[in-house]
Amino acid sequence: MDATMMHTPMTVQLILQHGAEVFPDSRVGTFDGESMRYKRYAEIAADAARLAAGLRALGVRPGDRVGTFSWNSTAHLEAYLAIPAMGAIMHTINIRLAAEQIAYVVNHAGDRVVLVDA
């Protein structure tokens, strides 16, 4: 008899891959302050994979901290998926802090890279 236990670990990487394969046309919507913007899950997965590859090219390795300084957006969602999927640690930085506080937080955390909203 099969148990109800899973045979595959539920890592962020496998959840992302599963979503892209099973629900490629499902959409994620974000409000940019003026209108809704939509992106397909397959596109988010592909962009997250590109981001992870870019971070690896910058020298980010499993266990390294990557800061994110961003509003809620699909780009930030892609970072939420890419960073832990590659084994790095995501460190969200409060965008409402003063510049000196941000500098302290980033330096104290030891972020290897900080992703910033443009």
Annotate each PLM feature.
Residues 10, 42-46, 96, 115-118:
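Conserved phosphate-coordination/catalytic loops
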Residues 1-6:
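A detector for short, charged/polar N-terminal pre-domain segments
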Residues 15-17, 57-58, 85-118:
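Structural core segment of the AMP-binding/adenylate-forming
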